[in-house]
Each structure stands twice: as structure tokens, then as C-alpha cells.
Amino acid sequence: MERYIVGLGEALWDVLPEGAKLGGAPANFAYHASQFGHSAVAVSALGKDDLGDQTAKELDEKGLKHIMPRVDYPTGTVGVELDADGVPTYDIRTGVAWDYIPFTPEVEAAAHNCSAVCFGSLAQRSEQSRETIAKFLDATPDDCLKIFDINLRGNFYTKEVIQESLKRCNILKINDEELVAIGRLFGYPGLDIENKCWLILGKYNLDMLVLTCGTNGSYVFAKGLKSFQETPKVEVADTVGAGDSFTGAFTAAILSGKPIREAHELAVKVSAYVCTQKGAMPRLPEKFTAQIKD
């Protein structure tokens, strides 16, 4: 049976100064992974409203499979403001559809046929979605890549949620600011960046830890290996979705059998390109996608 790369969690609309654009880390991730020839699916929940209809329509138009049951809450929206460098701050609405993702038979079937799943901390702010994410992860095959793209937002996370997620994942994706927050949360703020990463990798027996540091480059740590890549200098339109495109490209490359350093190099190039485009889900040029398509 065909196996899927799954983005699991929040489906929402980023309300930017120039208008609303479909976003949410899981859909962004799944969309970018799908551009490399992998079957991908976004799993979330939508409201029984016009925005829910528009979400399904837009994902269909992008050719992205989605499992998003309709629930009795509004489809998620996020107010996004960009600073002079295109870096976003978020006003995330609460009590929305993706806070109530049900573990339906179709969602469970996606877990059983999953080659990689990416999830974050934001959708775990509510009990129902947190339980669905845990059940999904526990139902995946043994060889599934379980990527915790931590995505700390505001105060929508707890130490317990982070620890449980680290126990369930085998790859952690984190940025430098989040690493500082986690160091503070877990009581090892004195260590330098690299030692914090090695400590987390060993403590939670992770296969890989991916650290992005904005314009200061990015790292991949694995047992016996450290990869570093400079961040290319580009004309930034906005950075919304850039991290998700990095994770999507990296995951697709690893599943295609690429070595870690090669997967890392591709992810950096893809992420830099997405920064030059408006919105989180631009179409990627073939010079990127052709590198790992069969």
C-alpha cells in the first residue's frame, strides 16, 4: 500500500497585511514534501464555514490530499504582522477547529500508512488535538520518521507537552530562539548551542536534531555527525512558511535515500527560495524538485 508523508496539526489562514493566505505548519510541510514526488497528506480539522470550504478548495487546487473532518468550531485564523525584515509576529485565535481534531478511522488509516509525520507543539494546546496527535504517533509503523517541529508560539506550550513530544519523536527540528527557551525550561541554560543540541539528542535518543539559526546558518546533528550550512543571502519577501519548506524538503530527501549533508543542503536552498516569495506555499522551481524525484 502507498505510504504517506503526513503534516499533522493546525490548519489555518494567515491574515497578512495584504490579505489572507492559507497556512499552518502541517499543511505547509505536507505541500512542500509533495512537490518532491512523495505522496503527502495534511491532517487537521476545519469549521463548517466558508473558510473551511475555501481551505478544502485551495488544497484541492494545489493537488494536496487532506483529511480534515468538519467540526462545530470556526476554521482557524492567525493575524500576522511583518517587521521591516519580513519576520512575522502572530496573533493566534483560540477555540478554533484545529483545537478539536478527531481521531477518525480515516486519520488512523493515515497513521498506519505513514512513512513520515511532522507535528508541533501548537496544536497540542488543547486536550482533544493533543490526544489525537499522541494516538496518531503511537499508531505509526516502526520505521516512520516522527519529526517534532517544535514551533513554539506565545504561551501555547508546557514543559509536559514538550517532554512527551520529545519522547515520541525521532527527529527534532528547532530554531535558535526556541533552543534558548527549551534550555530555560529544562534547566540547562549555561551550555553553548552545540552542547545543548548534543545533550538533547542523547537524552531523548533522537536519530537527528535539526537547528536553524536564521541568517546565521543551520545545523543537523546525528550520531557521529554534524552538518553545517550557511544561509544564502536573498531578497526577503516574507519568511512565513520558510521553516516548513526546509522540513518538507529535508524529509523528502531523507526518505529518498539522500545522505544527511545532501538533504541538509537541499533544504537550505529551498527555504531560502521560499523567503523570496509571498506566502507559505509557493510552487518550487524544478531545479530543486528534480534533485530527488524518481
What are these regions (language model features)?
Residues M1-L64, V78, V236-A237:
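Glycine-rich phosphate/adenosyl-contacting loop at the front of the ribokinase-like
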Residues M1-Y4, F186, G190-D294:
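Conserved phosphate-binding/catalytic region of the ribokinase-like
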Residues A109-A110, E164-S165, G202:
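Structural alpha-helical scaffold elements that stabilize or flank donor/cofactor-binding regions
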